[in-house]
Amino acid sequence: MNFSKIEALKAELQSRRPLNPSELKRLREEFMIEHTYHSNAIEGNTLTLRETALILQEGVTIAEKPIKDHLDVIGYKDAFEYIISLIAPECPLTESIIRQIHSLVLMDDAANRGIYRSVPVRILGALHEPPQPYLIAPQMEALLRDYTVQKQQMHI
């Protein structure tokens, strides 16, 4: 593989480091808001980007919007902050960590938090077909094995 473009972009990024703390905080917050909004919108959440930002930044409740939509936003924020907390100590990615993230994201769904689904699902309008429930655990194991190998071989 030719990594010259990646190397050039990496060098440009390195030349801008370190980011000042206020800029880093602003970028992280902006990313969290947009990621939370888009991730939840895909799942049918009715909040707008602005409403999502208000919930995350001001802690407000949006009138006439379902409480589930608010909990989805808060759950994504908690999961995002948890993931950020794992970066500095360089915690290895494990099934336990993935389940914990899942548990945070599904804060309003106690019955399904942190566990693999037990029923088949379909995504309307999508070509992708999610795996059958009995395949999820072995596919997660394979994913984590592949991740470990790829991480050791990555060009960083």
Task: Annotate each predicted stretch with a short phrase.
Residues 1-156:
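FIC/Doc superfamily catalytic core
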